[in-house]
Amino acid sequence: MSNSAQRDARNSRDESARASDTDRIQIAQLLAYAAEQGRLQLTDYEDRLARAYAATTYQELDRLRADLPGAAIGPRRGGECNPAPSTLLLALLGGFERRGRWNVPKKLTTFTLWGSGVLDLRYADFTSTEVDIRAYSIMGAQTILLPPEVNVEIHGHRVMGGFDRKVVGEGTRGAPTVRIRGFSLWGDVGIKRKPRKPRK
């Protein structure tokens, strides 16, 4: 077999190799960056994102980024995802907001006491296929906004307050799963699936 044929065979095997969860998340991060830069329209971004989470091989993932600048240099297969920020958000007699593009940690705790908070995951980059959120509100309120494609599991308790236990809509196969647990005491934890807004 010639050197050229050997290279082609290796490339073919490599492209058909099975992609990992990390590979899919890296492509999702690249697509989010492209959408943020205006290189992808919202509908194209969400379509590619769904296909990225459903992809099983490197070849399927490579097709999704082939026309995007920087695709040749990253993300790297088997490399690290972008790191996650703080795993604790507090609102004590005040408020917190986490919106826009940010990295969602594998575990996150939110707490409001006589305060309010907004946790918006619609434009965020997931660093894991499973995210555990512990949400607590005591005489406070918080809202968790979820993108259309994520899968959601909710186990919450409430005492003279509110804790949403269901969200409308189904997630996408292969997309991250967000598990939300916690309680509210004379407070509220609102959980909503909300579509992204097109760039202006």
Swiss-Prot record:
Residues 7-21 have a biased composition (Basic and acidic residues). Residues 1-21 are annotated as: Disordered. It holds the Pfam family DUF1707. This is Uncharacterized protein MT0994.
